[in-house]
């Protein structure tokens, strides 16, 4: 696609975690090789299936420490994960979350309380449900400016322009 320097597929899903009286929504994301590199402030970045790096703010607020086991549950008939519990091997940060706001969801209260990163093989999906795109020349434009927003919006329209064609291709493939 014209204007794309690099792209990488990823997986992500929202899950519930915690005790019944204090369930919170956690966004789980697959660890990327090239995009949005996470940092472990404590412990390590997951190296094996069943390991998780937790959001430092979420870990602090919920009392999680390296070595703890965190249990998660998916919504209804959603089966995107191979596991329902993970060992916390790291606590850290992600460039995707630079403010206190972790996003919105259709689960629980509608607010995501934190994020966690797991290995791609812990997702039980054949097809990516997210994509990260490095837009040509985006690094030369200051983030959050009108020029940056215009550049990204143009790329978003190009990607959306091929969506139906790609969905039909995938449908025929299956």
Locate the predicted segments by residue:
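Membrane transport/envelope proteins' first extracytoplasmic loop
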Residues: 1-174
